[in-house]
A protein has these predicted regions:
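A conserved short beta-strand
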Residues: 117-132
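Gly/Ala-rich beta-loop-alpha elbow adjacent to hydrolase catalytic centers
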Residues: 101-105, 109
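Hydrolases whose catalytic domains are alpha/beta-hydrolase-1, hotdog thioesterase
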Residues: 108-112, 132
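Catalytic active-site module of serine/aspartate enzymes centered on a nucleophile-bearing elbow/loop
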Residues: 182, 186, 190-215
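Conserved alpha/beta-hydrolase "acid-adjacent" motif
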Residues: 158-164
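Short beta-strand/loop motif that positions the catalytic acidic residue
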Residues: 144-146, 151-153, 157
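Short beta-strand immediately N-terminal to the catalytic nucleophile in serine-hydrolase-like folds
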Residues: 96-101, 124
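Serine-hydrolase catalytic machinery in alpha/beta-hydrolase-like enzymes
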Residues: 2-96, 183-193
Length: 215
């Protein structure tokens, strides 16, 4: 089992009993592993027998230490960090490992899921393109992705809304769960009658069901 030093790398949230699976959960570009979004989602997942290990990319850890915002590192740096964390996990633990991430974190995970032999992949608000630049697609690898993948996406996401995504070529391994009236942070409009807290609980339920069936 993992030692204390190993777990110091992560924010761990465990279910009361034996977990069905472990999710390595990465943050988006602007908010780190302790964001309310990821904290709440981790608690909801634990209630559904899913263990999460959240982590900060090095640029975010530096930003936290310095008390100021920093831009994300280049993709190769982020991908290297993902690889290192998965290697550390596999050296310390065994069992099904799922890669997961919000926005940028999910995109980086999607680039590595097949390479790393992940049991599955969860993307929360996948950034199909930069905001305001729908011509700059980040979808080429999604057409051939073999890893079972769940993308949870707001219908109004400015980085890939429902109408846009309908026109993309996605691999059969990918399932998209749409959140009505929600934005990139899965926050719905008031007229939906739902709060973001309720949406995150529903999202955790979708993830747990996907994990139970193995995607």
């Amino acid at each position: 089992m993992a030692d204390e030093l190993y777990l110091d790398t992560f924010r761990e949230v465990r279910p009361a009993g034996s977990p069905l699976a472990t999710l390595l959960l990465a943050h988006g570009s602007g908010a780190g592993m302790d964001s309310p979004f990821l904290e709440h989602l981790a608690v909801e997942l634990a209630r559904r027998e899913i263990r999460t290990l959240r982590f900060d990319f090095p640029y975010m850890a530096r930003a936290r230490a310095e008390g100021k915002r920093r831009p994300p590192s280049p993709a190769p740096v982020l991908l290297t960090h993902w690889r290192q964390l998965v290697a550390r996990w596999r050296a310390a633990e065994s069992g099904p490992l799922w890669l997961a991430g919000k926005s940028m974190g999910g995109r980086m995970a999607s680039l590595l899921a097949d390479e790393l032999g992940a049991a599955g992949l969860i993307c929360l608000g996948y950034p199909f393109h930069p905001a305001g630049k729908p011509e700059r697609l980040r979808t080429e690898h999604l057409a051939t992705l073999a890893t079972p993948t769940l993308i949870v996406q707001g219908e109004r996401d400015a980085l890939g809304n429902r109408e846009e995504v309908a026109g993309y070529t996605l691999a059969p391994s990918i399932e998209v769960q749409w959140i009505a009236t929600a934005d990139h942070d899965l926050k719905p409009l008031k007229r939906s009658g739902l709060s973001q807290t309720e949406v995150l609980a529903d999202t955790a339920a979708h993830i747990a069901a996907f994990v139970r069936t193995g995607g």
